Structure formats: C-alpha cells, structure tokens
Design a protein with these regions (language model features):
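Accessory substrate-recognition/RNA-binding modules or partner subunits associated with SAM-dependent
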Residues: 2-137, 145, 154-168
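Conserved SAM-binding loop and adjacent beta-strand
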Residues: 165-177
Length: 177
C-alpha cells in the first residue's frame, strides 16, 4: 500500500477527506492544505481522475529529520530514483517549507536535484535533463522545522487545469473552486 498526499486549497481539507474516503482511501489524516492517505495505484489513478477538490496527488517517497542541506542531499541520494522514473524523462524539483530554519530554499532545490542526478549517473551512467517549464517528472520536497519529506507528483499539470480551455475569458475560475 502506497502513501500519498493530496494538495487542496485551504479550507477544503475536510471536504477533500470525505471525497477521498468515498474513493476508497484509507488512513486519512487532514492537515493544513491537504490530506495524507494510503491506497493502491488504482486509488491514485482514481483520485487524479475523479477528485474535484485536489490540485495535485503526491506519492510519498521518503521522510527523515535534517539539520542542514547535506542531510537533505543524503536522504535524496539514498532513494533509487531509476526505479521511479526513466533517465529519458525531464525533471524539476519543487521545494516548499513551513518554519524551515535553512537560509535558502533555492539551495535545497539545487541539492535535491544534484542528489537525483548523481544517483542516476551512478546507477545508469547518465542523468535526466532538467526542464523548469513543462517537466515529465516533478520531485516535491516539503520541509518543516526539522523534517524533510520527498514526494513524486502523480498529477502532471495541476488538476484544476483539467479541460483547460484554449479560449478563455478575462477572469476564469479554478475548476476546483
């Protein structure tokens, strides 16, 4: 059974919890900005296809305490990234934090990117290309005061952009609002 985190706009967490429960999610835990839950890959696919409240579904990869950027690098370098995606895929690392004591989230992003690329180079002999605008794979790093969590984005584009229209009006609404 895999662990996931569904991101949603603040204030919709309880509704998202009920929506995920109706899809078959287990071990739900509501938090600010989203819901932690467990399930199989079928549930992940269903959540991506059927959720009207989530903006992204993230797949939990690893979590550990940290004191410096080097600890975060070591956590990311320990993961077997080639098992999760192919070296031919482009990638991007996104870092968010709450009460993080580190000075630069951009530096954390760079260190995680280096760890992923170093892991690929050591195990496959080459590294994935970085694409900031439209990557195939998004690695999400979430930092709290003393914990780092790594996720892979299973959604691609934000889910509120489903059915995104080429012709739009001046003030379109997000589809999940």
């Amino acid at each position: 059974m895999n662990k996931y985190f569904a991101i949603c706009p603040r204030g919709l967490e309880e509704l998202l919890t009920e929506e995920l429960r109706s899809l078959g999610a287990q071990y739900l835990k509501t938090t600010h900005g989203g819901v932690h839950f467990s399930g199989d890959w079928t549930l992940c696919y269903r959540a991506n296809l059927e959720s009207r409240l989530a903006t992204r579904i993230l797949w939990f990869i690893a979590q550990a305490g940290y004191r410096s950027e080097d600890d975060i690098y070591k956590l990311a370098a320990k993961q077997n990234w080639p098992d999760h995606f192919d070296v031919s895929r482009t990638m991007r690392v996104v870092t968010t934090a709450i009460k993080c004591p580190l000075k630069s989230l951009d530096f954390v992003t760079l260190r995680v990117k280096d760890a992923v690329c170093d892991t690929f180079r050591a195990r496959v002999g080459e590294r994935p290309n970085i694409e900031t605008r439209n990557p195939n794979v998004r690695v999400h790093v979430f930092l709290t005061e003393n914990e780092c969590t790594l996720y892979l984005d299973t959604s691609g584009q934000p889910l509120w952009q489903r059915g995104y229209r080429k012709a739009s009006v001046d003030a379109p609404l997000k589809e999940n609002l």
